């Protein structure tokens, strides 16, 4: 395939950017706009009263040796207070137990203004067992945007020749 010369390269750049942008928008729903309505399982515990709830979480332990699971019609939540101190408290639960009026997005964490804690949301079975709720899929969007940006630079350089 040969590239057209001059102004047509700019048109190709615009078309390719639109195609990749559209494909990226198709992939973004994987991050779900709001907590889902289907039922998932979330861990329900507080490290203040249950040492099994602490990080690092032992997700390889037998189910009887893990904190209880509950059915959740929303997102799983993991809250950490007094992060990286001997007073650290980890709480794992479902959004149905929170009175929160925020637009919640899957695999999003909100930090305390002091930087000593955070609250993360996720929507897969037992996802609130993770130390870090960001998944590889969360970084996929950044990688896609970087690829689109690099292709745009390459096409721009080709059009300037």
UniProtKB/Swiss-Prot annotation:
One of its GO terms (cellular component) is plasma membrane. CDD domains: TFP_LU_ECD_Qvr. Expressed in mushroom body (at protein level); overlaps with expression of Sh/shaker and nicotinic acetylcholine receptor (nAChR) components also involved in sleep regulation. Expressed in the adult brain and head. Enriched in the mushroom body, anterior optic tubercle, superior protocerebrum, antennal nerve and visual projection neuron fibers projecting into the lobula plate of the optic lobe. A lipid is attached at residue 128 (GPI-anchor amidated asparagine). Residues 78-92 are annotated as: Loop 2. It is found in: Cell membrane; Membrane raft. Its main location: membrane. Residues 55-68 are annotated as: Loop 1. Pfam families: QVR. It is a lipid-anchor; GPI-anchor. This is UPAR/Ly6 domain-containing protein qvr. It comes from Drosophila willistoni (Fruit fly).
């Amino acid at each position: 395939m040969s590239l057209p010369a001059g102004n047509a390269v700019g048109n190709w750049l615009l078309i390719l950017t639109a195609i990749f942008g559209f494909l990226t928008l198709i992939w973004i729903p994987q991050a779900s706009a709001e907590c889902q309505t289907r039922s998932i399982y979330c861990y329900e515990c507080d490290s203040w009263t249950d040492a099994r709830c602490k990080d690092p979480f032992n997700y390889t332990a037998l189910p009887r040796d893990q904190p209880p699971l509950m059915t959740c019609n929303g997102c799983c939540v993991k809250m950490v207070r007094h992060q990286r101190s001997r007073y650290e408290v980890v709480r794992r639960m479902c959004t149905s137990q929170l009175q929160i009026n925020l637009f919640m997005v899957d695999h999003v964490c909100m930090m305390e203004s002091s930087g000593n804690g955070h609250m993360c949301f996720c929507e897969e079975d037992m996802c609130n067992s993770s130390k870090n709720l960001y998944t590889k899929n969360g970084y996929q969007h950044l990688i896609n945007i970087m690829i689109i940006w690099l292709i745009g630079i390459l096409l721009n350089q080709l059009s300037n020749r």
